[in-house]
């Protein structure tokens, strides 16, 4: 899942780099689709795989633009719910008597998006450069796994979708800010917060996906100009970005369908069991000089 929202952080800086290749484009787009919605950090995996196999960081701008494909998958998968929220929100704006759950949900998503927008814009340089350090990514992969385990153990997992409140939305929105750090995972941060709040796994997961839509779409569009001629990371052509986005969409849709079924009967601790050895492996590769920090 960015995870994460490296997203609002992709602004330019004058240091041109090499062009991204087609194989790298397709592989990273598939990885983006597979990992965006799983709480294992999509931005972290893109950073690691790009460095390991191509010796270069594809960059925050490439990541943010390709994430448009995975967010399109969310729009298609949850099209019915999204349409109900949009129509319900507009209906409530113009008619107080029609202010039902969808109207409140619309405001929840809007309000919960504000923190990550502010932090993403104010901290764009820090996020694009310093926080993309591989040692940080590896450490966070391990440390944040403990949050998953605690959330599963402490969360009551009783509250349903129609019991969501503005308090839940604000807390999950603040948790979404953690995704600005590669390795945290946007979905991991927001879903864990939802579990701590007592939401059912399916509810926390669904709201996490809906909550990501404004921030990820906004960051992708914001990063689009820089992706063609980035200051940091590799440059991609319009065709490469288009193909990459399509790959991310298809794989992302499949990932959503799988995860929604998985969380109905399985603990998120399974993802912690993956993240910990993955983080340790990255640290080992860094120590051996096989990865650049």
UniProtKB/Swiss-Prot annotation:
Q: How does it sit in the membrane?
A: Multi-pass membrane protein
Catalysed reaction(s) here are: di-trans,octa-cis-undecaprenyl diphosphate + H2O = di-trans,octa-cis-undecaprenyl phosphate + phosphate + H(+)
EC numbers for this chain: 3.6.1.27
- Enzyme class, UniProt record, top EC level: hydrolase
Alphabetical GO CC annotations of the entry are:
plasma membrane
Q: Name its cellular compartments.
A: Cell membrane
Regions that span the bilayer: 74-94, 107-127, 134-154, 209-229, 243-263, 271-291
Q: Which domain of life is it from?
A: Bacteria
Query: For this chain's UniProt record, which GO biological process terms are given?
Result: cell wall organization; peptidoglycan biosynthetic process; regulation of cell shape; response to antibiotic
A GO molecular function assigned to this protein is: undecaprenyl-diphosphatase activity
Tell whether Protease is among the UniProt keywords. no
> Which keywords does this Swiss-Prot/TrEMBL entry list?
Antibiotic resistance, Cell membrane, Cell shape, Cell wall biogenesis/degradation, Hydrolase, Membrane, Peptidoglycan synthesis, Transmembrane, Transmembrane helix
Task: Give additional notes from the record.
Answer: Bacitracin is thought to be involved in the inhibition of peptidoglycan synthesis by sequestering undecaprenyl diphosphate, thereby reducing the pool of lipid carrier available.
Function as written in the Swiss-Prot or TrEMBL entry: Catalyzes the dephosphorylation of undecaprenyl diphosphate (UPP). Confers resistance to bacitracin.
Assigned protein family: Belongs to the UppP family.
Q: Which HAMAP family is this protein grouped with?
A: Undec_diphosphatase
Name of the featured protein: Undecaprenyl-diphosphatase
